[in-house]
């Protein structure tokens, strides 16, 4: 095994599309209490006014429920839902085809909106502000601009890289909403609900064990639940207990903090090859044979949230918690006393 277990990666996999396990309303949705409370107000206000809800931007690490919240918004607004992604919208005509087919007050969800091409983004501006499309017809001296009126709609954008959004695009979202990692208690509720939906008997200690190792991410919690249920059915009596959960997750390479082989390789690399850092992100990515984006978007957010690493102007450094977790003695060289003393 040379790379991290995809079970613990927060990117969407085909099995994550099981809609039966997804909450269907804000009432069912667990976690993100502040975001849910605000969305409930904005949704109710839009319904009372009979207008499209303001454009909304969800940002934060992957797997926290951006797509699910967008679908719930459309359902509670009582309107249609269309879904696409930034890389799919390669040219203005792709976006125009979607926008011109929206019904009044529909929700259009664009995942990975930070990956929109500049030419498509330019077409999106008047659509967001004036509900109109300005398209250039023809070429050269004969070219002319044609304005097409659109039905009022709500754009919901989702991004894991808020800093990559251009300022003009970011400023056109009236409701920017950051999604946070989930608490262990919240994930426990999600796992227990998932087990019930799957028709699996579970012990509180069993669901808690999965929640503890799910990296604060519901998508990962759902994946781990499915794998533990597999072990419970094949190697147990079908009941999700703490013992079967611990055995299954340990065999999957998931430790008690939720770190997998990829995370431990990252920490081990900095500890053993670079004395705990600082070391540049490009060096880390090259040594792990990963892209810089993969390291910054997939591996580092949870390590930062857990206080295992530090980002400094000179590069990444291990925090004392990382040394302790890996069972490695930190170096006693110059400059280490403040961090590890």
From Swiss-Prot:
Q: Which organism is it from?
A: Cereibacter sphaeroides (strain ATCC 17023 / DSM 158 / JCM 6121 / CCUG 31486 / LMG 2827 / NBRC 12203 / NCIMB 8253 / ATH 2.4.1.)
EC id: 3.6.4.-
Q: State what protein this is by name.
A: Holliday junction branch migration complex subunit RuvB
- Region (Small ATPAse domain (RuvB-S)) residue ranges read 183-253
Family the entry assigns:
Belongs to the RuvB family.
Q: Name one GO molecular function term.
A: four-way junction DNA binding
Q: Give the main localization category.
A: cytoplasm
Q: Could you say which enzyme class this protein belongs to?
A: hydrolase
Its localization reads: Cytoplasm
Instruction: Share what the entry says about its subunit structure, partners included.
Output: Homohexamer. Forms an RuvA(8)-RuvB(12)-Holliday junction (HJ) complex. HJ DNA is sandwiched between 2 RuvA tetramers; dsDNA enters through RuvA and exits via RuvB. An RuvB hexamer assembles on each DNA strand where it exits the tetramer. Each RuvB hexamer is contacted by two RuvA subunits (via domain III) on 2 adjacent RuvB subunits; this complex drives branch migration. In the full resolvosome a probable DNA-RuvA(4)-RuvB(12)-RuvC(2) complex forms which resolves the HJ.
Q: Offer a single GO CC term for the protein.
A: Holliday junction resolvase complex
Q: What's the record's remark on domains? A: Has 3 domains, the large (RuvB-L) and small ATPase (RuvB-S) domains and the C-terminal head (RuvB-H) domain. The head domain binds DNA, while the ATPase domains jointly bind ATP, ADP or are empty depending on the state of the subunit in the translocation cycle. During a single DNA translocation step the structure of each domain remains the same, but their relative positions change.
Q: Any idea what job this protein has?
A: The RuvA-RuvB-RuvC complex processes Holliday junction (HJ) DNA during genetic recombination and DNA repair, while the RuvA-RuvB complex plays an important role in the rescue of blocked DNA replication forks via replication fork reversal (RFR). RuvA specifically binds to HJ cruciform DNA, conferring on it an open structure. The RuvB hexamer acts as an ATP-dependent pump, pulling dsDNA into and through the RuvAB complex. RuvB forms 2 homohexamers on either side of HJ DNA bound by 1 or 2 RuvA tetramers; 4 subunits per hexamer contact DNA at a time.
Q: Where is this region: Head domain (RuvB-H)?
A: 256-341
Annotated positions binding DNA: 292, 311, 316
Cited CDD domains: AAA
Q: Residues annotated as region Large ATPase domain (RuvB-L)? A: 1-182
Q: Which GO terms describe its biological process?
A: DNA recombination; DNA repair
Residues that coordinate or bind ATP: 21-22, 63, 66-68, 129-131, 172, 182, 219
- Binding of Mg(2+), residues: 67
The catalytic activity, as recorded, is:
ATP + H2O = ADP + phosphate + H(+)
């Amino acid at each position: 095994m040379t790379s991290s277990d995809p079970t613990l990666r927060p990117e969407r996999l085909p099995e994550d599309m099981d809609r039966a396990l997804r909450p269907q309303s804000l009432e069912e949705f667990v976690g993100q209490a502040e975001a849910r409370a605000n969305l409930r107000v904005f949704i109710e206000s839009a319904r009372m006014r009979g207008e499209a809800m303001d454009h909304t931007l969800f940002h934060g690490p992957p797997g926290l429920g951006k797509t699910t919240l967008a679908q719930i918004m459309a359902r509670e607004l009582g309107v249609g839902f269309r879904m696409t992604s930034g890389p799919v919208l390669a040219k203005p005509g792709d976006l125009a085809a979607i926008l011109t087919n929206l019904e009044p007050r529909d929700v259009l969800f664009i995942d990975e909106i930070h990956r929109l091409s500049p030419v498509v983004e330019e077409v999106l501006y008047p659509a967001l502000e004036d509900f109109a499309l300005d398209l250039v017809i023809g070429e050269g001296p004969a070219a002319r601009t044609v304005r097409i009126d659109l039905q009022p709609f709500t754009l919901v954008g989702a991004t894991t890289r808020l800093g990559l959004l251009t300022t003009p695009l970011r400023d056109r979202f009236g409701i920017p909403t950051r999604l946070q990692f989930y608490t262990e208690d919240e994930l426990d509720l999600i796992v227990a609900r998932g087990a019930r939906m799957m028709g699996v008997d579970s012990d509180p200690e069993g669901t808690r064990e999965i929640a503890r190792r799910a990296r604060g991410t519901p998508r990962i919690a759902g994946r781990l639940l499915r794998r533990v249920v597999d072990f419970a059915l094949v190697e147990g009596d079908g009941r999700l207990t703490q013992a079967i959960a611990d055995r299954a997750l340990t065999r999957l390479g998931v430790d008690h903090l939720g770190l997998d082989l990829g995370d431990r390789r990252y920490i081990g690399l900095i500890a053993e090859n670079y004395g705990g850092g600082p070391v540049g992100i490009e060096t880390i990515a090259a040594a792990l044979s990963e892209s810089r984006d993969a390291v910054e978007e997939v591996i580092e957010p949870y390590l930062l949230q857990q206080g295992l690493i530090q980002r400094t102007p000179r590069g990444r450094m291990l925090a004392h918690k990382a040394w302790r977790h890996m069972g490695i003695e930190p170096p006693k060289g110059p400059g280490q006393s403040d961090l590890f003393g």
